[in-house]
Structures are given as C-alpha cells and as structure tokens.
C-alpha cells in the first residue's frame, strides 16, 4: 500500500526526532544515504520482504536484520524498517528515507544539488565546485555528478532551484540570442 505524503512525513519526522534526541544526526545522514542508495532497486528487495502468512512475516523481518545489522546501521533505523515490513509498507521505505534525509540536511544547513557535465568529474573538481557554490548560496553544498552529453562541454549546477550554467551549450544559446536582437 502506498502511503499518503503526510504519513510518509510522519514516519520521517519520528525518525528525525530520534536522530536529534539521541545526537545521531551526522550518523543518520551517512546511514540514510547508504540505505537510499542500497534500496534503489527496491522492487527486488520489496518482493523478498513481502509475506502472506506468519512464517513468511518472521522470515521477512529476519531478512531485514541479517541484511542491515552486520553493517552496524542504527537500531532505530533497523526497527523502523522492521515496522514497515510488519505492516506491509516496505514499498514506501525509500520515500520515507528521502524525506528523512532532507530533514537531516536542513537541520545541518546542508543543501543538495546536481552538477551536470559531459564526463565524470574528479573528486578535486567536484570539491572545487562545491566550495564555489557553497559560497554563492551561503550553505554547505553536497553535489551529485550526472552526465549530460547535450552540454557539449563545461558544467551546469542546479542547487535549490538556482541554475549556475557554465556549459558551452548555454554560452552558444546566449550568443544566438545576442545575434538575433
């Protein structure tokens, strides 16, 4: 069953409050991001933790424990995953985790952004871009690099709805506009 946004937010808020109360915000940022990434192909995992009888339910909960406990995920996060399995709501896990992740980042005054480039950026390049954009938006910025071959060259950064476009494509379009006026 797909949950309403308000219910997803309630789950995320409950986990956020635990993270703050237990002083686990930094740990949760890392762990929640890892969970989001590991559950990106959630359909297969969702099938593993679905059940139709009591024994399958116990097996599904055991799968959660055996999958995440060895990686030392926080017990509150593991228990939340178990609750979602028990209530057959695991399909909503990534949405809940994404809402939680956003709350955690907001709490730490960190914003997420995307840097588009024609090829994968090095850690040094990404770090330099983060620093420059952080100064522009007055917040710590975390960037994900996505490949966009339509840029021709250069980069385009999207943070908080703001676009910083240094791509050759954008420069050509600006030149085209100038020539047409």
From Swiss-Prot:
It comes from Mycoplasma capricolum subsp. capricolum (strain California kid / ATCC 27343 / NCTC 10154). SUPFAM superfamilies: N-terminal domain of the delta subunit of the F1F0-ATP synthase (SSF47928). InterPro entries: ATP_synth_OSCP/delta_N_sf (IPR026015), ATPase_OSCP/dsu (IPR000711). F(1)F(0) ATP synthase produces ATP from ADP in the presence of a proton or sodium gradient. F-type ATPases consist of two structural domains, F(1) containing the extramembraneous catalytic core and F(0) containing the membrane proton channel, linked together by a central stalk and a peripheral stalk. During catalysis, ATP synthesis in the catalytic domain of F(1) is coupled via a rotary mechanism of the central stalk subunits to proton translocation. This protein is part of the stalk that links CF(0) to CF(1). It either transmits conformational changes from CF(0) to CF(1) or is implicated in proton conduction. The lineage of its organism: Bacteria, Bacillati, Mycoplasmatota, Mollicutes, Mycoplasmataceae. This is ATP synthase subunit delta. It is found in: Cell membrane. Disulfide bonds: none annotated. The keyword Transport applies. Keywords: ATP synthesis, Cell membrane, CF(1), Hydrogen ion transport, Ion transport, Membrane, Transport. GO terms for molecular function: proton-transporting ATP synthase activity, rotational mechanism. It is a peripheral membrane protein. Belongs to the ATPase delta chain family. Its main location: membrane. One of its GO terms (cellular component) is plasma membrane. F-type ATPases have 2 components, F(1) - the catalytic core - and F(0) - the membrane proton channel. F(1) has five subunits: alpha(3), beta(3), gamma(1), delta(1), epsilon(1). F(0) has three main subunits: a(1), b(2) and c(10-14). The alpha and beta chains form an alternating ring which encloses part of the gamma chain. F(1) is attached to F(0) by a central stalk formed by the gamma and epsilon chains, while a peripheral stalk is formed by the delta and b chains.
């Amino acid at each position: 069953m797909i949950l309403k946004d308000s219910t997803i937010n309630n789950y995320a808020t409950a986990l956020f409050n635990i993270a703050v109360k237990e002083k686990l915000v930094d740990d949760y940022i890392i762990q929640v991001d890892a969970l989001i990434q590991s559950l990106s192909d959630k359909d297969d995992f969702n099938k593993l933790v679905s059940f139709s009888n009591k024994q399958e339910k116990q097996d599904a909960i055991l799968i959660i424990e055996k999958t995440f406990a060895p990686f030392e995920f926080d017990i509150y996060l593991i228990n939340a995953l178990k609750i979602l399995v028990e209530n057959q709501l695991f399909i909503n896990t990534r949405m809940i985790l994404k809402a939680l992740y956003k709350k955690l980042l907001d709490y730490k005054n960190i914003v997420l952004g995307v840097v588009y480039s024609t090829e994968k950026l090095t850690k040094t390049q990404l770090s330099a871009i983060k620093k420059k954009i952080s100064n522009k938006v007055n917040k710590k910025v975390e960037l994900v690099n996505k490949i966009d071959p339509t840029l021709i060259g250069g980069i385009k950064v999207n943070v908080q709805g703001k676009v910083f476009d240094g791509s050759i494509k954008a420069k050509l379009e600006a030149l085209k506009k100038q020539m047409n006026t």
